Amino acid sequence: MYCKEIDNMKLLEPIKVGPITLKNRIMFPPMTTGYEERDGSISKQSFNFYKRIAEGGVSYIVLGDVAPVNTVSPTPKLFKDEQIPAYKELADALHEFDCKLGIQIFHPEYDVQALAEMFKKGDMQAARAKLHHDMLHFTDEVTPEALNTILKKMGECVRRAYEAGVDVVEVHGDRLVGALCSTVLNHRTDEYGGSFENRTRFALQVVESIKEHAPHICIDYKLPIITDNPLRGKGGLKIDEAVEFAKKLEEAGVNMIHVGQANHTGNLNDTIPAMGTQPYCFMQSYTKRVKDAVSIPVSAVGRIVTPQNGEALIENGVCDIVGYGRSLLADPDYVKKIEDGQPCRIRLCMMCNKGCTDSIQNRKFLSCVLNAENGYEYERTITPADDKKKVVIVGAGPAGLEAARVAAVKGHDVIVYDKDTQVGGQLNIASVPPRKEEMNRAIHYLANEVKVLGVDLRLGKAVTSEDILADQPDEVIVATGASNFILNIPGKDMPHVQDAWKVLSNEQFPAGRIVVIGGGLVGAETAEYLALRGNDVSIVEMMDTIAKEESTTIRPEMMADFEKHGVKQFTNTKVTEITATTVEAETAEGKVSLPCDYVVFAVGARSNAFDMTALEEKNIHVQVVGDANKVADINSAIESGYLAANAL
């Protein structure tokens, strides 16, 4: 089990990296957050986010994608001296926790100045066309003179960082630097193209520029590897060349190397794989090749979830430093809990990518569906209640359990009722479809927390308001969740018509030709689940997209499964009737008749009602949270449970 304590963990040992010493081997690797000001300066939200992670015990934090120019990208920027004080304030704050600050310097693959002029003129069509062109051709078309200008701007950025007290500069070896290194993307015939020496020339010039502008700063280098499947990333080096280049980086004065998956495809699942799409620690074989070739420290990233994952990487000589990215979003106190001998209490990341990766791709700020404080650090905090209360919670799904956890942390006496004999609510079926088993970590965390905190958990008991009154509560939180909705159409009560939730919970077992009515997330997951078991599956959806709510990093995997297993998709299609052998439907083109042995309903959920009359008559304050209030997702469930309980 991940919660088993490990004695004398190497993860907690200090390590010397060039001119600095890290207090432990756990780093927060570069991630785009969307927290910065419009000009890329450090905002209060950004400052609080990084400070909170430092407070949790990590030794090294890297700000991702820091641009030395005013790009259109929503990333941090350090292109003018006026931005230095904010970076200095952040560096000073991290240093209070003995945490080193790094910036990952990068340059995008487009003409920043030309695009800025187009945006200034309001010529959006030309700007979009220019951006699209440059993303495909800038690597080949950028002149040596322009590259020299970029080098100077990078050097000035490094100088500003050093003046701000930044400890480490990490070269982003992907993006423009990685594209120039790549045999896949670089087709140049000048001194920056062709041979290995030429393709890596600019990268080494960046390193030299850092040394020139900040001779005493620690230098990190993100070394992107083009793995066995080059479609997953093109902007970097294949492993044999990467190993040779790592040696050159060490010779050039780089102090550590951060090995990662190359990415130049626009799909963040390449570098930040979602649950079930890549093995844990999926980059370890490539990282070890690099580690074996150099004597400087090497860091590893890539679906590293548990303390045991990281410890094994160090023990097995794969790396010296471990990057926990999404894991620290889920639980910024990850390191403290290891140090305190409480790894069981770590809120482990599910790797769902909904709050983090999807948010960034949708131009929202970074968040975590399991951590309601993420993005609101030092604004949302759990503090002891002024008055101890008895709190009764109805429902032990994610909203109810989170409310119970928070209320207990605040010092209240908490009772939780649930009609089922196990906790977790809908998470128990959400973790069944392909790739979704990792959602069980959320159940494990919440169940363990309420146990540790002494919550009185009363399972297998359906309660009424009158029952609750016997407990003499001061506060009641209703978290009764939702139930699958069966569409009222002719034939819905026939014996071969089933419920997607019951299918996923192994209460019903359709087989043969199956029509799933509803192509939302549950319908699509159920269809995939049934197709992988050898059934002939069709999905009928009224809207124009199947699984629209699925993570953008997972949906391509689902669609690939649909194609592989022959799942037929009918969008913009309305079901009109179910017969003994068919599902009748209508499209804009006319009627469709789908033969079937079974029909499975997955058209959505409806909130479960709870009669609060008796409680209201006694003037007991009642809050309704999660799907019981409004059907949504786990993010909404956790957040509403947190906020309701924290207000007590």
Describe the predicted segments one by one.
Residues 2-394, 398, 402-409, 413-414, ...:
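Flavin-dependent oxidoreductase catalytic cores
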Residues 23, 318, 470-472, 595:
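Alpha-helix C-terminal capping/helix-to-coil transition sites in glycosyltransferase folds
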Residues 219, 298, 457-459, 497, ...:
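Generic structural signal for residues in well-ordered beta-strands
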Residues 270-276, 320, 427-435, 542-547, ...:
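Short beta-alpha connecting loops at secondary-structure transitions
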Residues 386-417, 458-466, 480-493, 501-552, ...:
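Rossmann-like dinucleotide/flavin-binding elements
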Residues 416-453, 529-573:
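Rossmann-like dinucleotide-binding cores of NAD(P)H-dependent redox enzymes
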Residues 444-485, 576-582:
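Feature captures the FAD/FMN-dependent oxidoreductase FAD-binding
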